[in-house]
Amino acid sequence: VSSSADEPDADDLRVAIVRILADPDSGRRVTREANALLDANDPEAMRAWLETGYRIAQAEDDRVAITRLLADPDSGRRVIAEVNALLDANDSDAMRAWLETGYRIAQAEDDRVAIARILADSSISPALRAAANAALDDNTPEALRHFLEVGRYQVA
């Protein structure tokens, strides 16, 4: 039973933590801390973590995810430049926002450059040229990435 009508009870706190665990953006630290809280079953600790600890854990997980992009061979110049700027700024809110929307946009720009490089090769087949142009015509981040990861290998 909640001590106040506005405060979530223990079951509400557990549900909130389980929802965080179900989020694919939850990294290792968030997962580790959330599981430990569920195991301990301490409503006050859960409340405190949801109020402040979760943001701290998510910020660390976001920093790790962003840093890993530096080692990813698919990360092009725009992604790397934006990652370095984010790491220099050290703003956890900016990192979260970039992971949610900015990364997709930066990767799409890098993918457009990669496809343009493929098209610049005069020895590619007409089918590969058509598939590359179709990806550029579609111009969605998903179509560009799909062409680079799958589509270019499916044409003769």
Residue ranges and their predicted role:
Residues 1-156:
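Extended, compositionally biased repeat/scaffold regions that form elongated interaction surfaces
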